[in-house]
Amino acid sequence: MNDYKNTLNLPKTQFSMRANLSQKEPKILKNWYDNNLYKLIRQKKEGKKIFFLHDGPPYANGNIHIGHAVNKILKDIIIKSKNMSGFDAPYIPSWDCHGLPIEQKVEEQMGLKSNNIITTIFQKKCRKYAEKQIKKQKKDFIRLGVIGDWENAHLTMDFKNEANIIKTLSKIIEKKYLYKESKPIHWCLKCYSSLSDAEIEHFDKESDSIFVAIKSKNNKILKEVLNLNISSEKDIYLPIWTTTPWTLPSSQAITVNPIFEYQIIETKKYNLILAKELVKNVMKILEINHWNILSSFKGKILEGKKFLHPFLENISLPVILGDHVNLDSGTGAVHTAPDHGPDDYIVSQKYKIKTMNLVDFKGNYINNIHPKLNGVNIFQANEIIINLLIKKDCLLHHNILKHSYPHCWRHKTPVIFRATEQWFINIDQKKLRYKTLEEIKKVSWIPKWGGSRIEEMIKKRPDWCVSRQRKWGVPMCLFLHKKTGKIHPENTLLIKKIIKKVELEGIEAWWKINLKEMLGETYNMYNQTFDILDVWFESGNTHTVIKYKNKKYSKNHADMFLEGSDQHRGWFMSSLIISMLVKNQSPYSEVLTHGFVVDKNGQKMSKSIGNTISPNEVVKTLGGDILRLWVASSNYSNDISISNEILKRSSDIYRRIRNTARFMLANINDFNPQKNTVLKENMVLLDRWAISQAKIVQEEIIEFYKKYNFHAIIKRLMYFCSIEMGSFYLDIIKDRQYTLKTNSQERRSCQTAIYYIINALVRWIAPILSFTADEIWNHLPGKHAQYVFTEEWFNKLFDLDKNDLFNREFWKNLIEMKNEINKFLETEIKNKNINNSLEACLILYVTPEVKKTLNILGEELKFIFLTSKVKIELYNTAPINSTKSKKISNFKIFLKKIKEKKCPRCWHYNIFIENNNDKICTRCILNTKGNGEKRFFI
């Protein structure tokens, strides 16, 4: 038997079937960085329109987690797709370097608290620690395939950046937005520092829930005011409800709502003043079934009336009025401690009630409050206070309530509101809040709800507390008058001098300042403040300093910010406020947010649960491209699920794309684009369709990239690779590619189409499957750029002429017909009427119009349906036992088993020449010894 293998153009390629990504990717990375790929991209894009995605700085502490990977990969996909779309899209990575977590790590390493270490020495240790963490994280980010200007990353601890943060603060001071005040702010008892809203997380907590009866100071006067004609000798009480009994020592008033209706309720033991709408609920909680209504009145009547503190002697609590009192729960009256609540503080200011500062920075009561409370920690005080209330016979009810409570984002411990003297930015000064809300409307928010979310946050947010009582951070650089506490009148000029020092020495310069040299003769009249700025102020200022890296990127604002959905109250907000303060405009045109990574059950990743997946482990086992594909396949606008099963599905998708590329590469192994490319007008019709289909897909994919709809790209790619190419085009062209003459125009036409398509395909996947795209690029024949990443979308694809007989509509109908025939043949094979489609002689019954069109294709029609013979007949001549199509009207199919012999070379059942020593069909003789088979259509 003759071996015809050597007469066939069988596919060959060194592009392996097995990806071995974990082994190949490090080598690819080395090549990128040995050749400074990022610089090559920038050189190629010089002069193009800038697209600047401003990198939100991750914190320089610990290993990267899966959320970091999602964030960096999404950014990298966008940057690469923008470069591919004709933009100059740089990527300058950022890091947030100051802050408490680094302080704590350094304290652990040194075995000392920062207070016991010389500040400048401690800061240098923190700087070294941050550098080490950045080096580690940078390596991991690069391993993900993220291309950027890693050697010139933006670090908040760079001396110039530290100086610029001080410069920004100086501008804010000049505009009179900064003020100092003692007011309640979130305070962490572990950090010993104030916290911003962005540093707060809410978790469930069990708290003591108590109803306390607060006795009227003068029953007689109160009865007169309320026109109460009753003989009852019972005292009148104004009950309050609280879940923070420890705040009662700081209580200075009781607030009621002026417009609510209140009633005096007589019970067996007390006369209670309650909001009318809450009476039934309170009685139910107190388990009181019988009561009488003695009087009704508006809350405003109670203003100024005095009640006695429930357990502190000789302290009266006046009734004040406040709109914040609601009917959601409680009694309609709120005990008011301006030290421990923003609403309490605001309402107290109207009545000139000042804070008392009874709780120190560790959460302990100061002395001289009550003998049983002196020096006691507030969280141990609840039991003591409840016992005091019981002894005073004013505890109406006590139970344990589970509710959402603010916690420190670092320590995961409950925080408190504590009145301390801090520096604030006035959000309402010069209509800043209003202007910011207006600016939000000009930004494109993706998803759209992001705009509504930050808008609500801006509406409700308090003034920004920007001061912190720590050491590793940018100092506020203020000189305060010892008597008045006012900022030095020449502080702006002084800050300019300090900025120059910080640019040379870093923040450490502030702690080295000689006051006499700096202030001259007035030095002994001023104190140097050592408060540092909130780290959110630092990261929120990063958009103002990118220009130092490259002046051409210093446009008015970034094109995009992209972070997790928690950053609406974090970096998005701090950046927005600072930009409004300094430039009176938003720092971004677009803001894109992604969800959090959760496990397959929707649970948040947690070490304690044991459901975490490390990006480094995924990269080591499956490769960076699988992780990138998982990110791109996910609908990132919601929470993103990950598990080994989900990653396996990503691997399956990857395999389909890789195998499609491999098949294409294998079939152009002998193709020289400079010599063998066939012009459009000379191409086989099917090849023209394939190129036009690729053009349509490219247009769709470009639009998906433009809209950041990456999972739609993967879905479209899969359909293109599996159906339009795999099940249709690439399956059909095998016969022409393998059996025709090597250098025939028909075969080179097919190779031209494949070459064009894979040139487009490699660009489509480059932003997502970057390592694989690079590998494909290096296996493409002909001359081309060194890297796909310097290129733009492939521009040699073309469309079909819509006026042509064989236009898109023709191919759409033909593919529908093929799909129906495929189902028919599958049934025939299943019923064992034939072994495979090449044993079939198909007779198709169609309308006269369709018959006329299909007959133009002649003998080539069989290659579309992968059969050895096809006949076209009129629909009305179809035999009774023919199969009617369910999808296509006026279309029937009939099958006859082929009578001809099978050709051992092409496997078609064909005509043979008698006494043919070659034992192959006439078509194969023509292709091996003759001038070759002619193809025009398929």
Curated annotation (Swiss-Prot):
<dbReference type="InterPro" id="IPR014729">
    <property type="entry name" value="Rossmann-like_a/b/a_fold"/>
</dbReference>
<feature type="short sequence motif" description="'HIGH' region">
    <location>
        <begin position="58"/>
        <end position="68"/>
    </location>
</feature>
<comment type="function">
    <text>Catalyzes the attachment of isoleucine to tRNA(Ile). As IleRS can inadvertently accommodate and process structurally similar amino acids such as valine, to avoid such errors it has two additional distinct tRNA(Ile)-dependent editing activities. One activity is designated as 'pretransfer' editing and involves the hydrolysis of activated Val-AMP. The other activity is designated 'posttransfer' editing and involves deacylation of mischarged Val-tRNA(Ile).</text>
</comment>
<keyword id="KW-0862">Zinc</keyword>
<dbReference type="GO" id="GO:0000049">
    <property type="term" value="F:tRNA binding"/>
</dbReference>
<dbReference type="InterPro" id="IPR033708">
    <property type="entry name" value="Anticodon_Ile_BEm"/>
</dbReference>
<comment type="subunit">
    <text>Monomer.</text>
</comment>
<feature type="binding site">
    <location>
        <position position="906"/>
    </location>
    <ligand>
        <name>Zn(2+)</name>
    </ligand>
</feature>
<feature type="binding site">
    <location>
        <position position="903"/>
    </location>
    <ligand>
        <name>Zn(2+)</name>
    </ligand>
</feature>
<keyword id="KW-0648">Protein biosynthesis</keyword>
<keyword id="KW-0067">ATP-binding</keyword>
<comment type="similarity">
    <text>Belongs to the class-I aminoacyl-tRNA synthetase family. IleS type 1 subfamily.</text>
</comment>
<dbReference type="GO" id="GO:0005829">
    <property type="term" value="C:cytosol"/>
</dbReference>
<dbReference type="GO" id="GO:0006428">
    <property type="term" value="P:isoleucyl-tRNA aminoacylation"/>
</dbReference>
<dbReference type="Pfam" id="PF00133">
    <property type="entry name" value="tRNA-synt_1"/>
</dbReference>
<feature type="binding site">
    <location>
        <position position="924"/>
    </location>
    <ligand>
        <name>Zn(2+)</name>
    </ligand>
</feature>
<feature type="binding site">
    <location>
        <position position="921"/>
    </location>
    <ligand>
        <name>Zn(2+)</name>
    </ligand>
</feature>
<dbReference type="InterPro" id="IPR009008">
    <property type="entry name" value="Val/Leu/Ile-tRNA-synth_edit"/>
</dbReference>
<dbReference type="InterPro" id="IPR050081">
    <property type="entry name" value="Ile-tRNA_ligase"/>
</dbReference>
<dbReference type="GO" id="GO:0005524">
    <property type="term" value="F:ATP binding"/>
</dbReference>
<dbReference type="InterPro" id="IPR023585">
    <property type="entry name" value="Ile-tRNA-ligase_type1"/>
</dbReference>
<feature type="short sequence motif" description="'KMSKS' region">
    <location>
        <begin position="604"/>
        <end position="608"/>
    </location>
</feature>
<dbReference type="InterPro" id="IPR002301">
    <property type="entry name" value="Ile-tRNA-ligase"/>
</dbReference>
<feature type="binding site">
    <location>
        <position position="563"/>
    </location>
    <ligand>
        <name>L-isoleucyl-5'-AMP</name>
    </ligand>
</feature>
<dbReference type="InterPro" id="IPR002300">
    <property type="entry name" value="aa-tRNA-synth_Ia"/>
</dbReference>
<dbReference type="GO" id="GO:0004822">
    <property type="term" value="F:isoleucine-tRNA ligase activity"/>
</dbReference>
<dbReference type="InterPro" id="IPR009080">
    <property type="entry name" value="tRNAsynth_Ia_anticodon-bd"/>
</dbReference>
<keyword id="KW-0436">Ligase</keyword>
<dbReference type="Pfam" id="PF08264">
    <property type="entry name" value="Anticodon_1"/>
</dbReference>
<dbReference type="InterPro" id="IPR001412">
    <property type="entry name" value="aa-tRNA-synth_I_CS"/>
</dbReference>
<protein>
    <recommendedName>
        <fullName>Isoleucine--tRNA ligase</fullName>
        <ecNumber>6.1.1.5</ecNumber>
    </recommendedName>
</protein>
<dbReference type="GO" id="GO:0008270">
    <property type="term" value="F:zinc ion binding"/>
</dbReference>
<dbReference type="InterPro" id="IPR013155">
    <property type="entry name" value="M/V/L/I-tRNA-synth_anticd-bd"/>
</dbReference>
<keyword id="KW-0963">Cytoplasm</keyword>
<dbReference type="GO" id="GO:0002161">
    <property type="term" value="F:aminoacyl-tRNA deacylase activity"/>
</dbReference>
<keyword id="KW-0479">Metal-binding</keyword>
<keyword id="KW-0030">Aminoacyl-tRNA synthetase</keyword>
<feature type="binding site">
    <location>
        <position position="607"/>
    </location>
    <ligand>
        <name>ATP</name>
    </ligand>
</feature>
<keyword id="KW-0547">Nucleotide-binding</keyword>
